[in-house]
């Protein structure tokens, strides 16, 4: 697991939750 990927995935979840 890479921190960059984890941060990217977290960003997608936040954006998806926002929509």
UniProtKB/Swiss-Prot annotation:
Q: What is this protein called?
A: Conantokin-Pr3
Query: What Pfam families does the database record attribute to this sequence?
Result: Toxin_36
Q: Which family does it belong to?
A: Belongs to the conotoxin B superfamily.
The organism's taxonomy opens as:
Eukaryota, Metazoa, Spiralia, Lophotrochozoa, Mollusca
Annotated function: Conantokins inhibit N-methyl-D-aspartate (NMDA) receptors. This toxin has the highest potency for the NR2B/GRIN2B subunit. It induces sleep in 10-day-old mice when injected intracranially, and hyperactivity in 24-day-old mice.
Annotated residues that bind a divalent metal cation are located at 10, 14
Can you quote a single GO CC term?
extracellular region
What residue range is the signal peptide?
none
Residues bearing the modification 4-carboxyglutamate: 4, 10, 14
In the record, Asparagine amide modifications are located at: 19
Q: What does the record's miscellaneous section state?
A: The mature peptide does not contain cysteine residue.
Q: Which residues cross the membrane?
A: none
**GO MF entry, a single one:** metal ion binding
Q: Where in the cell is it found?
A: Secreted
Print the keywords alphabetically: Amidation, Calcium, Gamma-carboxyglutamic acid, Hydroxylation, Ion channel impairing toxin, Ionotropic glutamate receptor inhibitor, Magnesium, Metal-binding, Neurotoxin, Postsynaptic neurotoxin, Secreted, Toxin
Which organs or tissues contain this protein? Expressed by the venom duct.
Q: Which residues carry this modification: 4-hydroxyproline?
A: 3
């Amino acid at each position: 697991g890479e921190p960059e990927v984890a941060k990217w995935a977290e960003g997608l979840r936040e954006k998806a939750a926002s929509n």
